[in-house]
Amino acid sequence: MGGGKNVRRGLEPLEFEECIVDSPDFRENLNRHEKELDHTSHQIKRIIKEVKDLMSAAKILSTRMKQLAILLNDFNFECIGTAQTDDENVICESLKRFGAIIGNIEDEREKMLTLADKHIIESLEDFRKKQIGGVKENKKKFDKKTEKFCQSQERFLNMSTKKPENTIQEADASLGMHEREYIQESLSYVLRIQEVQERIKFEFVEILLAFISGWLVFYHTAHEQAEDHRDYLQDLRHKVQKTRENFEEAREKVTELKTKYMEKRTKPEEIFTKRGYLFLMEKSSILKISLLEPFKATWTKYYCTFKKQKREFTMLQFNQMNHNFTRPEARDDEKLTLFSCQRRASEFEKRFCFDLTFKEKPGVVYTFQALSEKDHRYWISAMDGTEPTYLAPGKIKVSEAYHLDEAGFMFIRRCIQVLEIRGLEDEGIYRKSGVGTKISKLLALGLNQKESDDVFVDDKYRDLMESNTIASALKMYLRNLNEPLMTYQYHSDFIEAAKQETLNQRVNEVHKLVYKLPQPNFQMLDMVICHLTDVSRKYEKNKMSVFNLGVVFGPTLLRPREESVAAILDIKFNNIVINILIDNYERIFKNKPSADIKLPDATKAPSIMYPSRSSPPTRMPRASQIGKAASTGAMGSSSNTAGNPMFLNQQKIYRVVSKTNCTEPTMSSSLQNIPNGDNYALGSNAMNSSGGAQCISLSPPMHMLNGILSPTIGSINNLHTISKNETSTRRYVPDTEIAPDYGIIGANNGGVTLQSHHAVPVSSTSNFRHPEYLMTTANPVTQSGSSSHIYTNTSSAGANSSNRISLSNVSPPNTAMRKERFLGSASGPQQHPPVQRGLHSYGQTKHYSPLMPTSTSSSNDSVCDSLSSNNGLGSSIVANSGNSGNVAQHLSARNTNDYALISSQNSSLSPHLGPTCDEVVTATTLPSVSLSCGGTASESTEYPPSKMHRNRDVNQIKRDLSTGTARVRTLYACMGESEGELSFEPNQIITNVRYSHEPGWLQGTLNGKTGLIPENYVEHLKPHH
């Protein structure tokens, strides 16, 4: 009978209640029953085989035993003599007796074998085929009915609400019929499995009992053993009979219960308030929506349970047609806490739908579809569902929103503090999302004032302190605010600001709108953008550029009130607004917008607009194009070449470095901010405004004493010049039109007109990101020798001549001051000190001029290359005088070890600078240009702007251009418009650059192709020595 070591664990009964619900647990239990039945079938099959083999062997044995019995019975003892003794008679009869015993035994064997062959083997075969085989047939029918019902159910649920009512009724009736057949077959199958399992206990054992009894009867020698086992056998028979009686009684009750469940399919739940199958709508991400496949959704079948007391909702993806059984601990079911339940509006594309939200996933709405109207009502009732709130079409429904309160500010500060302490160098920060459960937990704890102090420092919350989790929690808080940080009120205004024609207009409009935000919104936005600014500085390591941050935070900070196709298409403008805020953080958040700022007309004054990479400067026309235009009259009258910008002497524009006496950081003009020479058309009004060429300059306070240039204070703090060619777009400003916001000073007769082109406070933080420099333009005049000159005429009437200041060398920037410029200081934004001129004085304001660019196309590295030196920084001087006599002036340099002394070759200049002035006034020029007093050009020069270089670097560049070994870096994208012109992208290196025969054009090689390149589209790289 075997020991008790391999006792199999009992199977759980198959309840009809579970059969109706058809839960995954029921399916698993059913599968265990099926496996156990297969195992039993296999064992019975082996037993039948062994019994057959035994019967065959027993028949052979019986034949041999009968032969032996015959031999024993026929054995004849012959007696010697005429009489035998009793012993001999007993001996002679013993063999016959033996034969008779063996015969009797073999007769019983024959009976036993006949009965075993007829009743044992046939009964076992019949039991296995009819009972276990019948279960397998039922399983096939059950699987077929299951598949047919599920497919019918899904077809019914997928029917559109636009179908006719009779079609829906027919489909409903068909589904009901299939459902009834499926349930009938399911109940029958469950009943049959349990019946077979129970039949094994008595029918199978009863057959084997008969087999054993036959063998015991067969063996006469086993009579005592039979007597010993009589009680056992009798007891076994009694138990078998009792089991049979129990089976008959249970079968009657089960039949009654089956009838009961066919009439009423459910009973009051004990563990779960409601459970069953639901279909979940899974929509594609809004960022993945395309115009070809908008709002594509899929419906996935889940087995769901709900406990009303704990409001615990579990969902497990499961489909009976393609299920895969796993261990209960390996199932990936999701447990959530129900927050709200709302019936879906009847206008929805599917029937029987309702929306659920959960505390673990705020702001996420789950849309489920029930299996029928009745099932739909049961779910709504169990979850205390509410009727839908009918909003306007396209309204965004926010299930749970955060508020911009003190707890929110504290949470954001803590998140930013932790992230910045870690260095902001995690790759993909704010792009890679953290674990959803951790994010929700961190938000819940961080916004709880009792827990917020501990969550960022307590070791038990260490698993929540991953950088991606913190960054995702910060984003989720901002995204789920009851109103976006930049408010619904100004959303369309921000979008319109991002659609402005020029970058400066966009920046100024965004600047104004930011200061219209409520104070809490402004403070939070200031904190977030300041943090994102720091993130963007670590772009090389975290790969989060300003553009990437705009993509991530655009929909978060600028959320539309209504969800529509138009709002989706405007997402790119959300990103542009965020890019502007990050790129111009210091300008926008540290300086209030001025009410009297007037933006220049981009169509009338393109020369002073900020040239972005998307709006590169106008290229210098080639000679062939100029000739063609001139022949058709497109360039104006040939008799008045002075009014034609193409025939004007193009001024050389240089990058000049300026330094204050002690505290001012280094400033330089940005190469990207230099206007195009061909845009500086010299109009007739500008030509008539003065007798000579005007150069409006911002100079230190000086007095003209007997023709000598004399300073009134010892430090030159700001020096800014604007070329004569800009007078067509920048009018002369008299003293009656002083505009302090722009730092403009007008002077009467006898004074030099001062105008600040970019009156900007320099912030150490912003300058580290985007170095903003003063732009200085100069009109080189005819050299009387080899020295270069810069001159300007006075604005006084009758002044037709100019004084010339001869400068031959440049004092390069000091390394320490250059480092101070790029590293900045902790003192925050700094302002220019006031400049006095005679009786007129003014103070620089804090705001940024709208003409000031917000970024440069040249990298910090290129600026450093152009400024690499160990000497002091300088400022350029432009001086005027009513006298035509010589002006003697001496220029002092702080360091003369590496540079040649300043020389005056044709004019004797003597120093008259104060003893406290530590500035070296310098300028660097390329080939000079001769201008007459009337301002007409006598010869044409090279057009494009050029970065300032030290004299020896400039000479080296000249030599490299002459020999064809110069190297340049492209600043803008350019598409070759005619044969012989190169096409290139920004930040490409062009080699073998040399002068060309076309004015304003160079010749170079890129990717093995040689052609012309516009000189104002490139900057020279530092020569290799």
From Swiss-Prot:
GO terms for biological process: cleavage furrow formation; negative regulation of epidermal growth factor receptor signaling pathway; positive regulation of receptor internalization; regulation of actomyosin contractile ring contraction; Rho protein signal transduction; syncytial embryo cellularization. Residues 963-1023 form the SH3 domain. Residues 402-589 form the Rho-GAP domain. Keywords: Coiled coil, Cytoplasm, Cytoplasmic vesicle, GTPase activation, SH3 domain. It comes from the Eukaryota. It is found in: Cytoplasm, Cytosol; Cytoplasm; Cytoplasmic vesicle. One of its GO terms (cellular component) is cytoplasmic vesicle. Residues 271-388 form the PH domain. GTPase-activating protein for Rho family proteins. Essential component of the CLIC (clathrin-independent carrier)/GEEC (GPI-anchored protein-enriched early endocytic compartment) endocytic pathway. During hematopoiesis, inhibits Egfr-ras-MAPK signaling by promoting Spi-induced Egfr internalization through CLIC/GEEC endocytosis, thereby preventing plasmatocyte overproliferation. Essential for normal mushroom body (MB) development and consequently the formation of olfactory long-term memories. This is Rho GTPase-activating protein Graf.
